[in-house]
């Protein structure tokens, strides 16, 4: 009985932590990723257009810059403008997690933490990218993260609709997606 209460308490805590995030029962879906993914063409600056809210992003003007390091890994620099006007940034590293599917990357921001999936589901390299990440939690449920990215601060609505259609056709829930405010933003990088 005590173990069941502990498990239920842990689940309640995880649900509270995942508030606003896409929390679902069952295992992560396995959508197809971008075919013939070219990492070198993907490098550079991307602006966040829409996302499923995540606890670690609190600001607006969110952007990411990907660059190749000497060791062949990818430097990831994420930046946002906080409500108080200060810039928050975090640097991490991305590596290929599946050699046969180069669009499946793993991203790590802290040494002792495991890599998080970073799957590029679709990109044309010049305008848009659709990124999906999903983590299974104790084999009972999963938490989705989705980012629609653009090389510019705004994407045409038909492009956003096209990318959301990819998600829904793979049974990925988009209900909690929100716009990222990119108005009057500085270029951080």
Curated annotation (Swiss-Prot):
SUPFAM superfamilies membership: Lipocalins
Positions of transmembrane segments: none
Sequence positions bearing Pyrrolidone carboxylic acid: 21
Keywords of the record: Disulfide bond, Glycoprotein, Lipid-binding, Pyrrolidone carboxylic acid, Secreted, Signal, Transport
Glycosylation positions in this chain: 65, 98
CDD domains tied to this protein: lipocalin_apoD-like (cd19437)
GO molecular function ontology, one term from the record: cholesterol binding
Intrachain S-S bonds: 28-134, 61-185
First-listed, main subcellular location of the protein, grouped into a coarse class: secreted
Signal peptide from the UniProt entry: 1-20
Gene3D superfamilies: 2.40.128.20
Family: Belongs to the calycin superfamily. Lipocalin family.
Record-given protein name: Apolipoprotein D
Biological classification of the source: Eukaryota, Metazoa, Chordata, Craniata, Vertebrata
């Amino acid at each position: 009985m005590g173990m069941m209460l502990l498990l239920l308490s842990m689940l309640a805590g995880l649900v509270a932590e995942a508030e606003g995030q896409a929390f679902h029962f069952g295992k992560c879906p396995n959508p197809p990723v971008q075919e013939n993914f070219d990492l070198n063409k993907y490098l550079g600056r991307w602006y966040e257009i829409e996302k499923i809210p995540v606890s670690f992003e609190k600001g607006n003007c969110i952007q990411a810059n990907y660059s190749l390091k000497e060791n062949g890994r990818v430097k990831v620099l994420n930046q946002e403008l906080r409500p108080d006007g200060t810039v928050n940034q975090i640097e991490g590293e991305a590596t290929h997690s599946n050699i046969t599917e180069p669009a499946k990357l793993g991203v790590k921001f802290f040494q002792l933490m495991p890599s998080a999936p970073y799957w590029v589901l679709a990109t044309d390299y010049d305008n848009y990218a659709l990124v999906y990440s999903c983590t299974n939690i104790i084999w009972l449920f999963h938490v989705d993260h989705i980012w629609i990215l653009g090389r510019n601060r705004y994407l045409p609505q038909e492009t956003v609709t096209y990318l959301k259609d990819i998600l829904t056709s793979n049974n990925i829930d988009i209900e909690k997606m929100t716009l990222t405010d990119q108005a009057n933003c500085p270029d951080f990088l």
